[in-house]
């Protein structure tokens, strides 16, 4: 014999209805969270992410300078401490912008130095070099592993070089030279953990278009100091060999660097 209690049955139906409603609501809420997370990730991937790095480059200077045909060729070989003694001005900054897998990178270097160099027959020449270079590249990023990625880049390096050689009481010659070199580059990053990472960068160019050859190499260790601030310690080499119409500008800069990166 079964006993049906109308009140009990009504309560069961009410509980079942509420349970179903809660289940559906939870499912909708979960799907909403997933949709919002996916939308946020998509928006982040589509937005430009930028960083700016002013840095100090403790570079030496080595090379040969002949500002015009027939002028004396001066050999320069200065350590950073010697360059610092004769440094007139210097400014270095680099920046990167990323959107999804696309990458834009730029670096600007400017330095002006002057020094006295010996010549044959007991003469002395005063050499002054003001060099500015702007490297602009773009390309694509590939994620190799969860900890490492590589950028393959192509672009140009724009040079503006003022060179002057003066032999007191004998002669003086100067030239202003500007040219553009095509460059190809590779940039590899490896994350050791959430705070420490390493960076390797190399490029090569010129190919006879502007200079005969230009190349650059850089290695750095980076530390995340604040949420959007990174500190870097590295070593950099940059060289160019330009020869045209009796003019020779063949020099390289090498030395350690310290940088601060601000991410936006």
Regions found by a protein language model. Name each.
Residues 64-81, 112-129, 160-176, 242-248:
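Flexible, solvent-exposed loop segments that connect beta-strands
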Residues 1-47:
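Cleavable N-terminal export/targeting peptides
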Residues 56-60, 80, 99-101, 108-114, ...:
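Transmembrane beta-strands of outer-membrane beta-barrel pores
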Residues 31-110, 259-263:
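Short glycine/proline- and aromatic-enriched beta-strand/turn motifs that initiate or cap beta-hairpins
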Residues 101-104, 147-148, 194-198, 225-231:
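Repeated loop/turn-to-beta-strand initiation elements of outer-membrane beta-barrel proteins
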Residues 46-48, 87-91, 130-134, 148, ...:
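Residues that define the transmembrane beta-barrel architecture of outer-membrane proteins
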Residues 52, 93-99, 136-140, 154-156, ...:
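Residues on the lipid-exposed face of transmembrane beta-strands in outer-membrane beta-barrel proteins
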Residues 216-264:
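Predominantly the C-terminal beta-signal and adjacent terminal strand-loop region
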């Amino acid at each position: 014999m079964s006993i049906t209690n109308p009140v009990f049955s009504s309560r069961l139906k009410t509980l079942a209805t509420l349970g179903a409603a809660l289940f559906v609501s939870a499912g909708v809420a979960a799907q909403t969270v997933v949709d919002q997370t996916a939308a946020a990730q998509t928006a982040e991937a589509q937005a430009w992410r930028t960083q700016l790095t002013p840095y100090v480059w403790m570079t030496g200077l080595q090379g040969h300078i002949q500002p015009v045909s027939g002028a004396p060729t001066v050999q320069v070989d200065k350590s950073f401490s010697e360059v610092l003694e004769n440094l007139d001005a210097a400014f270095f900054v680099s920046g990167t912008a990323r959107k999804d897998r696309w990458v834009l990178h730029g670096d600007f270097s400017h330095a002006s130095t002057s020094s006295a160099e010996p010549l044959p027959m007991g003469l002395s020449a005063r050499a002054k070099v003001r060099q500015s270079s702007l490297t602009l590249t773009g390309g694509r990023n590939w994620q190799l592993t969860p900890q490492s990625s590589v950028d393959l880049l192509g672009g140009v390096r724009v040079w503006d070089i003022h060179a002057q050689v003066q032999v007191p009481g004998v002669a003086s010659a100067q030239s202003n030279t500007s040219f553009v070199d095509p460059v190809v580059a590779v940039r590899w990053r490896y994350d050791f953990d959430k705070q420490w990472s390493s960076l390797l960068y190399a490029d090569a160019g010129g190919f006879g278009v502007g200079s005969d050859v230009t190349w650059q190499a850089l290695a750095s260790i980076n530390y995340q100091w604040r949420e959007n601030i990174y500190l870097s310690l590295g070593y950099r080499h940059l060289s160019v060999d330009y020869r045209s119409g009796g003019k020779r500008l063949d020099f390289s800069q090498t030395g350690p660097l310290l940088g601060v990166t601000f991410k936006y």
